[in-house]
Amino acid sequence: MLRLIIMALLVLPASVAWAAECAPEKMVRIVTRDATPGIDPQSFPALPKTLYRLGNGRGRVEEMPDASRGVHGLIVVNEPDAWIVNLHDRSGRHVVDPGPGLIFRAPILDGGGELPAPLRELEFGCELAFVQAYAPKSDERVDAGGGLMLDKHQLSRGDHRVAILVHPKDRGIYAVAHYKAGKIVRVVRYVEYQQGLAPDARLFSRPDGIQFAAPRPRASR
């Protein structure tokens, strides 16, 4: 369950200050994979992950099964409740957010409070809002291979730089790359991106058929 707990810390409300709030009015479904150079594309870290989010307090993260470790991760957040589940053995934890701010966060970049403030605002589901706010003008149009041309939007703060590749016609997100001191830290490749979906309350409800440990409140922020 360790990886699930770490993942939960990434998607649950963070203890660092956030200047902007990502709150899609309609449900968003995003499938991504880690395409960072050096990661084995056949390994578990490179397998697709699916995120659903709605409003500022509901989110769901689905991992692919990791049979070698006996883990099939699922995280469901419906503030103030969060359920961290291992579907492999049907076990889970129920965590209660004590507040005061009951906000679901899904940051794209690793680093938390170490990141410059604007970069902490870059979240799954609100990428184009970030581009519009901080890098509305494309730096260049790049060839992603096979003649696929993409608009490259960039923002730099200190040692950090983020590059967001966007399809020029439909403004769909193709990839996000994070650099520090000129070296690549992470590349997220978008496999699917669906917006404006009808809300499905079941996705953000307590998962059925899971043996949950007693609820544990998170430390107040």
Question: Model-predicted segments: where are they?
Answer:
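An acidic-aromatic
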Residues: Y52-R120, A181-R186
